Amino acid sequence: MQYWGKIIGVAVALIMGGGFWGVVLGLLIGHMFDKARSRKMAWFANQRERQALFFATTFEVMGHLTKSKGRVTEADIHIASQLMDRMNLHGASRTAAQNAFRVGKSDNYPLREKMRQFRSVCFGRFDLIRMFLEIQIQAAFADGSLHPNERAVLYVIAEELGISRAQFDQFLRMMQGGAQFGGGYQQQSGGGNWQQAQRGPTLEDACNVLGVKPTDDATTIKRAYRKLMSEHHPDKLVAKGLPPEMMEMAKQKAQEIQQAYELIKQQKGFK
């Protein structure tokens, strides 16, 4: 009920014998209480809406990316299942993800419209938008290569989310570097199975993860590291609208950034 604060404020004033002005004061205090409560309820409603949209759009677009290559293969479905496993999706959550994936595979999936809606709901939360794009890039690279059609779809996504081509290309390099720290999947040479990338990470890989150059000084590298860790902090992302089911992915990304930073410090000899 929206008027509990006013009712209680007036009742307290009457009980305490505050007279006319006491009632007015109680009414004003109650009104302030009701407004604060209403804002809090609206925030929770918007938060749930944002999380639900993020979840559904993630898997819809993933399905659209997969379909863009042509026929959806068993390997593609296996990759999507692996991602659901990484998120610990089971029961109703997994079914919802699978249904969203199927929606995205439809021939007339309105990608641009969906991205505009997503951007609107995530307005002012660039770290959420960045996390969404990183998930899509990771899914596109999951088979060890980026199909030209997948790249075209990713460019559309970036454009609609307000991300420049230069920013997007940097994200690609960062995700490719992250694959060597456990953030990607590559196809084995035979059998059609999939496994995590096994080539050991290099200094260049680590620098790509942080978006810096091997020649950058320690101050520049530390600044980039702290910025990325802040943007990928799991609790902050969930507070801004990341579905709780995807917190594990945010944690894994933060671990990649940490590992890359440790390798750079070791290779360049600074603390």
UniProtKB/Swiss-Prot annotation:
The chain crosses the membrane at residues 7-31. The gene is djlA. Keywords: Cell inner membrane, Cell membrane, Chaperone, Membrane, Transmembrane, Transmembrane helix. SUPFAM superfamilies: Chaperone J-domain. It is found in: Cell inner membrane. It comes from Escherichia coli O6:H1 (strain CFT073 / ATCC 700928 / UPEC). Regulatory DnaK co-chaperone. Direct interaction between DnaK and DjlA is needed for the induction of the wcaABCDE operon, involved in the synthesis of a colanic acid polysaccharide capsule, possibly through activation of the RcsB/RcsC phosphotransfer signaling pathway. The colanic acid capsule may help the bacterium survive conditions outside the host. This is Co-chaperone protein DjlA. The transmembrane domain is a dimerization domain. Residues 205-271 form the J domain. The keyword Mitochondrion does not apply.
